From Swiss-Prot:
Cell location: Plastid, Chloroplast
SUPFAM superfamilies the UniProt entry points to: L21p-like
Cellular component terms (Gene Ontology): chloroplast; ribonucleoprotein complex; ribosome
Subunit structure: Part of the 50S ribosomal subunit.
Protein name as annotated: Large ribosomal subunit protein bL21c
Domain of life from the UniProt record: Eukaryota
Organism encoding this protein: Anthoceros angustus
Family label: Belongs to the bacterial ribosomal protein bL21 family.
Lineage: Eukaryota, Viridiplantae, Streptophyta, Embryophyta, Anthocerotophyta
GO molecular function: rRNA binding; structural constituent of ribosome
Positions in coiled-coil regions: none
Name of the gene encoding the protein in the UniProt record: rpl21
UniProt function note: This protein binds to 23S rRNA.
InterPro entries referenced in this protein's UniProt entry, alphabetically: bL21-like, bL21-like_sf, Ribosomal_bL21
Single biological process term from Gene Ontology: translation
Length: 118
């Protein structure tokens, strides 16, 4: 059984399957300390669901579709370094930052009152 969904979160679109884990940036605009381990999450911004040979597409989002999951932990990604230089002007600038990511696992995909597990 090949079930997956495409969700919109954190400014990007992800293809998610039940039983797999994913790293998401900008998971919530709330305080990151709220995202403790095993915090349950419901995602309503589901763009498409594929189950066996059926495909359900939404006009922007699907109405009766949710993704149930839980947050495993939050962590930082490797540091991204930005180096700007203008030749012959003696201008050099070095900046860097680390993205705050939340790793979560998809428990099930719900659509029209049915739940699809792994």
């Amino acid at each position: 059984m090949n079930t997956y969904a495409i969700i919109d979160t954190g400014g990007e679109q992800l293809r998610v399957e039940p039983g797999r884990f994913y790293d998401m940036r900008h998971f919530t605009l709330l305080n990151p300390s709220i995202l403790d381990s095993n915090t349950k999450v419901l995602i309503y911004r589901v763009l498409m669901i594929h189950h066996e040979s059926n495909i359900a597409l939404g006009d922007s989002w699907l109405e009766d579709a949710t993704i149930k999951g839980r947050v495993l932990h939050s962590h930082f990604k490797d540091k991204i370094t930005i180096y700007k230089m203008r030749s012959k002007k003696k201008m050099r600038r070095k900046l860097g930052y680390r993205l705050n990511l939340a790793r979560f696992v998809v428990d099930s995909i719900c659509f029209d009152g049915k739940e699809f597990y792994k």
